[in-house]
Curated annotation (Swiss-Prot):
GO biological process: glycolytic process
Keywords: Cytoplasm, Glycolysis, Lyase, Magnesium, Metal-binding, Secreted
Designated name of the protein: Enolase
PROSITE patterns assigned: ENOLASE (PS00164)
Organism of origin: Levilactobacillus brevis (strain ATCC 367 / BCRC 12310 / CIP 105137 / JCM 1170 / LMG 11437 / NCIMB 947 / NCTC 947)
Gene Ontology MF terms in the entry: magnesium ion binding; phosphopyruvate hydratase activity
Length: 439
């Protein structure tokens, strides 16, 4: 047995300069693991609770000293003495200690910090890379990246309502090549925006946040940038986007209010708008196309779009197996976005990925807009053979850290590694995948 001997938490900063929780966990044998917790800007209302102090005299109320104290004074007393390799028991003990359905007592940020630190300490104790510890000998699939290169919505101050416009190097032969293709497209996009007189300042996730005219212009510019980089839109590099529709949905009027277009849409009209975009551009994935509480509208959208493109539930599912099970039963979406801090433990995260796979849904392992230098998600996506990762643009150190880790892992795995590209979309049939590639 490898016994946990000490746990210590502190307040550090995320990529937005806001406080977050960092946890260090030690074993009797001298192993150590560190976990830093991310945070989101647009959050689903059903997410696990991120405990903040609310003291306006510190960090404008965003301090996390309560969560830190909960680790040091409550969680540590319970978890010290556990076998560090017994991840499921450690996570369950913290869930029981909290005793609430949304981790509102101790804070998901406190619990997740310990969960991540325990996994890293166990890997350190065993002398294994984290992806190898989490996935065993089977973890070998490098993910197709979703690279957020144009920001809108809550991630930027501009007229674009949709939150993220992403490129996916589906035609690459390896993740290293995919990252190169993404970088080249990113830099060609920057040159193109400069030529058009747009700002090339970047948003929270490292993508550009130009003040574009409407919600369609980003697609036009992305296609041009992909071509300028020497690639074929669709065949080499496809497009994904995140509507984050709950952010512009009016629950009283049941309308989607797009400021960039100066229009309001019913659910049916909005899905028709999305259909027109899918028909016109090489789109492979749409995230949160409808409001997180409108399940029947999601059903309608899935019937109309689910055979053509990946439909990812983020705010809809919030990495929660209860919501995912409901979605699977109703035939809602065909993919889940996996964010560790939405649910709060590594164990529950893995359970959500497994449930998705068993139902034929893809699982996209994701960062948050408030990120850190922690690279756990890069190891996790390989460990689980999830096949897709969403971890920001080709700028900002906290995003690049994940890409660098993926390239290290691919290098370590050597010839046993696999990059699936367009075939990572196993939720679409071959005809749908080829339609995107040949668009």
């Amino acid at each position: 047995m490898s016994i946990i001997s000490d746990i210590y938490a502190r307040e550090v900063l995320d990529s937005r300069g806001n406080p977050t929780v960092e946890v260090e966990l030690y074993t009797e044998a001298g192993a150590m693991g560190r976990g830093i917790v991310p945070s989101g800007a647009s959050t689903g209302e059903h997410e696990a609770v991120e405990l903040r102090d609310g003291d306006k005299s510190r960090f404008m109320g965003k301090g996390v000293t309560k969560a830190v104290d909960n680790v040091n004074n409550i969680i540590a007393k319970e978890i010290i003495g556990y076998d560090v390799t017994d991840q499921r028991a450690i996570d369950q003990a913290m869930i029981d200690l909290d005793g609430t359905p949304n981790k509102g007592k101790l804070g998901a940020n406190a619990i997740l910090g310990v969960s991540l630190a325990a996994a890293r300490a166990a890997a350190d104790e065993l002398g294994q890379p984290l992806y190898n510890y989490l996935g065993g000998f089977n973890g070998h699939v490098l993910p197709t990246p979703m690279m957020n290169v144009i920001n809108g919505g809550k991630h930027a101050n501009n007229k674009v309502d949709f939150q993220e416009f992403m490129i996916m190097p589906v035609g690459a032969k390896s993740v290293t090549e995919a990252i190169r293709m993404g970088s080249e497209t990113f830099h060609n996009l920057k040159n193109l925006l400069n030529e058009k007189g747009y700002s090339t300042a970047v948003g929270d996730e490292g993508g550009f946040a130009p003040d574009l005219k409407n919600n369609e212009e980003p697609f036009e510019i992305l296609v041009e940038a992909i071509k300028n980089a020497g690639y074929v839109p669709g065949k080499d590099v496809a497009i994904a986007f995140d509507c984050a529709s709950s952010e512009f949905y009016n629950a009283d009027t049941k309308k989607y209010e797009l400021v960039g277009d100066g229009k309001e849409y019913t659910a049916e009209e909005f899905v028709s708008l999305l259909e027109s975009i899918v028909d016109k551009y090489p789109v492979v994935s749409i995230e949160d196309p409808l409001d997180e509480n409108e399940w029947e509208d999601w059903q309608m959208a899935t019937e109309r779009l689910g055979k053509k493109v990946q439909l990812v539930g983020d705010d809809l599912f919030v990495t929660n197996t209860d919501y995912l099970a409901k979605g699977i039963k109703m035939g809602v979406g065909n993919s889940i976005l996996i964010k560790l801090n939405q649910i709060g433990t590594l164990t529950e995260t893995v359970e959500a990925v497994e449930m998705a796979k068993q139902a034929g849904y893809t699982a996209v392992i994701s960062h948050r807009s408030g990120e850190t230098e922690d690279t756990t998600i890069a190891d996790l996506v390989v460990a689980l053979n999830a096949g897709q990762i969403k971890t920001g643009s080709m700028s900002r150190g906290e995003r690049i850290a994940k890409y660098n880790q993926l390239m290290r892992i691919e290098d370590q795995l050597g010839k046993t590694s696999e990059y699936k590209g367009i075939h990572s979309f196993y939720n679409l049939d071959e005809d749908a995948r080829m339609a995107i590639v040949n668009k």
